[in-house]
Amino acid sequence: DFANDRIIPDCVRAAASGKDIIVRNPHSTRPYQLVLEPLAVYLTIAMKQYEDRTFEGYYNVGPDDKDCVTTGTLADLFCAAWGQGQTWENRWMGGPHEANFLKLDCSKIKHTFGWTPRYGVKEAVEKTVEWSKEYLEGADMTEVMDRQIREFFIS
């Protein structure tokens, strides 16, 4: 995801250009997770639903409560993972109202499948920074993604 006004892509762009990260609302809480978390469990859900129709329905996939952090905390984790003295600043310039707290209720998937996230928010940010740096350095991204997928499934 390289879209504007997304915290991690904004962090990567700022860090890659040697600028401070601009955080619009450091006190808002969001359910941040590594993209591999929902993708992996969606495949499990699809397989289970294919095998047994009693599993049909919707499921929320999100981080554990302890990993629902503020945007400021996420920016801190990003800066620590990026290194090189990366910093962020709080700069709200108006704009549309944003909910201060967003969280997913993942109790159904946890109860039904015994699912728990493989990575906490710190590991998720570290893996995202690792991927981003390798992308910016022109690495073979197929190899990078294959390695990260293997690491994810053996964690």
Feature-to-residue mapping (PLM):
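Conserved C-terminal active-site "lid" loop/helix of NAD(P)H-dependent oxidoreductases
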Residues: V35, G57-Y58, G94-T116, E137
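Non-catalytic, hydrophobic alpha-helical segments
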Residues: P38-Y42, V61, T71-L74, I109, ...
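A recurrent short beta-strand within the Rossmann-like NAD(P)-dependent oxidoreductase core
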Residues: D20-R24, R30, Y42, E51-K66, ...
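NAD(P)-dependent short-chain dehydrogenase/reductase
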Residues: D1-M47, L74-A81
